[in-house]
């Protein structure tokens, strides 16, 4: 062990340490400067040296030279020995082996190569994360290429016919608005012209009236009568004019409302056409609740009507059921004729059942029939009661009829 360690020079070991250190990443350099990392690495180096038959002095010296060589080559050469002295308290076994010539094994937690690998993996992972974030924000045009600023319209969504139709509709709407404005302007100008004419006519009338008053100044009584007549005529004319104006205004309003309604209906039809241009307009839409094609209309025959499962008792059925009730047996249903009630009960216990809807219907019929069963005395009492009621009704009707006949005949006799 000792002669092998003595044969190598510390300068060569330092140079070897420099070469090894040049292949490392910069993050591992910073982490190796901490005292804990130095401690663990010195321990791992000592173990590694023992396994390969090398002394602890070489490993300690190489570790110190590695730590210092990352700063600069010029500084590392001058500070090799002091750095070895600094690392001596943390790796006492390595320094004692170098100066004293004996070695003492010191157990470390983990070998330093595994820590370096972890640090490298961490740095690579951080780089990948940052690259992914950058690509997510900016994109990668060299891989995917830039997306088009104005995407081309899809052939299915935008057809040239559909693109032309909205243009036509907009032009038609604008033209209709212009026509409305022109009509309003023309109506206003007409009203102004009418007002001017009325003013002129009123002025002329005033002039004529003044001339007449000058000429007829001698006869005041005649002029006063004429004035009153004229005033009455003027008032009548004004009333007539007002009525005419009101009628004209109403007509104009009705015309405008009609035009607006027609315009709104045309706009709605245009919007509907834009929504679905392929819809058939010739056929009027009829609200139908049914969805899908209509079933062929066939005349309902008597065979198609639902079967009546016997609401009333058949002849002789009531007596047979009464016998079953007296015996305390189950009344057989109509669908179960041919079997005894005991057989039917055994079948039902073993799990044989009728179809659900038929079973329910039959059960209801059975219960109703059980309620319909009366004894002989009850039947007699009911028959007598019914006969009495019928006689009373008949007597009332006959009496009322006799009274009516008597009145009619009595009236004829009196005449």
UniProtKB/Swiss-Prot annotation:
Segments passing through the bilayer: none
One Pfam family cited in the UniProt record for this chain: Nkap_C
Residue ranges, annotated region (Necessary for interaction with CIR1): 177-272
Phosphothreonine carried by residues: 159
Residue stretches of biased makeup (Acidic residues): 212-225
Cross-link Glycyl lysine isopeptide (Lys-Gly) (interchain with G-Cter in SUMO2) residue location(s): 283, 305
Compositionally biased residues, Low complexity: 23-32, 54-71, 84-108
Record field: compositional bias (Basic and acidic residues): 116-136, 156-168, 259-270, 277-286
GO MF annotation list: chromatin binding; chromatin DNA binding
Subcellular location: Nucleus
Keywords: Acetylation, Isopeptide bond, Notch signaling pathway, Nucleus, Phosphoprotein, Repressor, Transcription, Transcription regulation, Ubl conjugation
One BP annotation, GO: hemopoiesis
S-S bridge residues: none
Gene Ontology CC: nucleus
Ranges where the record places region Necessary for interaction with HDAC3 and transcriptional repression: 273-415
InterPro entries: NKAP, NKAP_C
Region (Disordered): 1-309
N6-acetyllysine, modified sites: 110
Composition skew (Basic residues), residue ranges: 33-44, 181-208, 230-258
PANTHER family noted in UniProt: NF-KAPPA B ACTIVATING PROTEIN, NF-KAPPA-B-ACTIVATING PROTEIN
SUBUNIT field: Component of the Notch corepressor complex. Interacts with CIR1 and HDAC3.
Protein family: Belongs to the NKAP family.
Role played: Acts as a transcriptional repressor. Plays a role as a transcriptional corepressor of the Notch-mediated signaling required for T-cell development. Also involved in the TNF and IL-1 induced NF-kappa-B activation. Associates with chromatin at the Notch-regulated SKP2 promoter.
Protein name: NF-kappa-B-activating protein
